[in-house]
Curated annotation (Swiss-Prot):
Entry's transmembrane regions: none
GO terms, biological process: translation
PROSITE patterns: RIBOSOMAL_L19
Similarity-based family: Belongs to the bacterial ribosomal protein bL19 family.
Protein known as: Large ribosomal subunit protein bL19
Described function: This protein is located at the 30S-50S ribosomal subunit interface and may play a role in the structure and function of the aminoacyl-tRNA binding site.
A Pfam family: Ribosomal_L19
Keyword Endoplasmic reticulum: no
Coiled-coil spans in chain: none
Disulfide bonding pattern of the chain: none
Highest taxon listed in the record's lineage: Bacteria
UniProt-recorded Gene Ontology molecular function terms: structural constituent of ribosome
Cellular component GO terms, alphabetical: cytosolic large ribosomal subunit
Length: 117
């Protein structure tokens, strides 16, 4: 067996996360260790891309902090991620939403997909 696969299996978290795609608004609960204290920080934003596959899959979340756009990349199998919650399902036609970086205000909004149920 390949040594890389053995290492990946050893560090796999085994957590189940909900399925989401680009355009969805998600809240990521991320564990942060500061010195000897540990806290959970919630990071809410729009998923602008999902890259990689398998254990190396990662997603980029963009949020507005005041007037500045902040993007953060999270590995999906990170042990520091407590939970991922999907808040809104967006209706987009692209897999990578880089065009949102240039838009501000109401133009940067994403339509919400209606779910019949």
């Amino acid at each position: 067996m390949d040594l890389i696969k053995i290492a990946e299996e050893a560090f796999a978290t085994g957590k189940q996360h909900p399925s989401f795609k680009a355009g969805d608004t998600v809240t990521v609960a991320y564990r942060i260790i500061e010195g000897n204290k540990e806290r959970v920080q919630l990071y809410r934003g729009v998923v602008i891309k999902i890259a990689g596959h398998g254990e190396k899959k990662r997603f980029t979340v963009r949020k507005m902090s005041g007037t500045v756009g902040v993007e953060r990349i999270f590995p999906i199998e990170s042990p520091a991620i407590d939970s991922i919650e999907v808040n809104k399902v967006g209706k987009v036609r692209r897999a990578k939403l880089y065009y949102l970086r240039a838009l501000t205000g109401k133009k940067a909004r994403i339509k919400e997909k209606r779910v019949n149920g």
